[in-house]
């Protein structure tokens, strides 16, 4: 391990854009399939990992939803969430904010209570055993109807105090944010923070819709905003966080090579950019691997890496007091490692 990799791995980082269903490592997926009497198309973890080659977002989603089928019982959700949080802790993550999309599971007959108990139980374990700050976000699917999303909003209300935000993901093209304007107003009216996947494959107009019509607190991805200079200025002025996922963008052909990733351009234009994993096993890395890939391909300085990490801590859905504690952890780490304010 190089000094830089050790430094980055040790930084107290965030992962603000990660899907529990997309965090199933290949061997665990096979184990869960066996536990639930299922037969996958792949017999070994190596063969399954070899299938993680995608042409676009939809080709990934096809495999993603197939993987969801191995999550059936409360223990399955607990094991997957526990495994991710353990890996995140080992990677130096101090604040993790996890999406889960219950619609994929409840439509197959999985009780929402089983899903929530499994996920929340693993989160409580991580707080107790690792001192990890962790929050849960409920994501609705944009390829479904707004009425479906409203039903899900009603169903999750018994867990309102344990949910930090409402989000939306899935195939962007043909599913603009405006389709869910009433749903997000209802979520805000019920006191939820909000965030939306926009500008990953969709245009800058989708990012603007998320910001102006849905009035979200954060944008997930957001890369396409660069096509609209006025939108960039508004995002920068309002300090709207963008939860960018570099390795995800590379694997899904959003960029042809990491050297062409817009992350550094976004930073240069004053956008509040954070680096996250999205679906780490599918895309080849946790937060450290994402930062290292950007460092190498985009020639990021240590100062720029620290700035990205600080942005994540500032963008987290936490209280002011919790944020101060997290930022103090970063400042203490930098002081111990004698990191200068310039590279």
UniProtKB/Swiss-Prot annotation:
The active site is at residue 200. The record marks 221 as: Important for catalytic activity. Coiled coil: none annotated. GO terms for cellular component: cytosol. Substrate binds at residue 279. Keywords: Hydrolase, Metal-binding, Nucleotide metabolism, Zinc. Binds 1 zinc ion per subunit. SUPFAM superfamilies: Metallo-dependent hydrolases (SSF51556). InterPro entries: A_deaminase_dom (IPR001365), ADE (IPR028892), Ado/ade_deaminase (IPR006330), Metal_Hydrolase (IPR032466). HAMAP family: Adenine_deaminase. NCBIfam families: aden_deam, PRK09358.1-6. This is Adenine deaminase. It comes from Rhodopseudomonas palustris (strain BisB18).
């Amino acid at each position: 391990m190089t000094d830089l990799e050790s430094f980055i791995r040790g930084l107290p980082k965030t992962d603000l854009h990660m899907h529990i269903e997309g965090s199933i490592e290949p061997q665990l997926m096979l184990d869960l399939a066996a536990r639930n009497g299922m037969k996958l198309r792949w017999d070994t973890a190596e063969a399954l990992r070899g299938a993680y080659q995608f042409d676009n977002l939809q080709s990934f989603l096809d495999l993603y939803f197939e993987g969801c089928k191995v999550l059936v019982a409360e223990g399955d959700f607990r094991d997957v969430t526990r495994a991710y949080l353990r890996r995140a802790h080992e990677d130096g993550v101090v604040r993790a904010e996890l999406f889960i999309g219950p619609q994929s599971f409840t439509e197959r007959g999985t009780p929402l209570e089983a899903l929530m108990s499994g996920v929340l139980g693993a989160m409580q374990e991580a707080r107790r055993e690792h001192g990890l700050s962790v929050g849960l976000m409920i994501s609705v699917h944009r390829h479904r109807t707004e009425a479906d999303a409203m039903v899900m909003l009603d169903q999750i209300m018994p867990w309102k105090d344990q949910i930090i935000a409402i989000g939306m993901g899935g195939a962007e093209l043909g599913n603009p944010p405006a389709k869910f304007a009433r749903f997000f107003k209802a979520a805000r009216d019920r006191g939820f923070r909000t965030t939306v996947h926009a500008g990953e494959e969709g245009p800058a107009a989708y990012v603007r819709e998320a910001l102006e019509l849905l009035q979200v607190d954060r944008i997930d991805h957001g890369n396409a905003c660069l096509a609209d200079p006025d939108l960039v200025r508004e995002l920068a002025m309002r300090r709207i966080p963008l939860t960018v996922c570099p390795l995800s963008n590379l694997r899904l052909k959003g960029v042809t090579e990491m050297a062409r990733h817009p992350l550094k351009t976004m930073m240069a234009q004053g956008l509040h950019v954070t680096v996250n994993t999205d679906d780490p096993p599918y895309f080849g890395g946790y937060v450290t691997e994402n930062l290292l890939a950007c460092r190498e391909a985009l020639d990021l300085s240590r100062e720029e890496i620290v700035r990205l990490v600080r942005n994540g801590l500032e963008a987290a859905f936490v209280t002011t007091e919790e944020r101060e504690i997290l930022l103090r952890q970063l400042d203490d780490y930098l002081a111990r490692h004698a990191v200068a304010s310039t590279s």
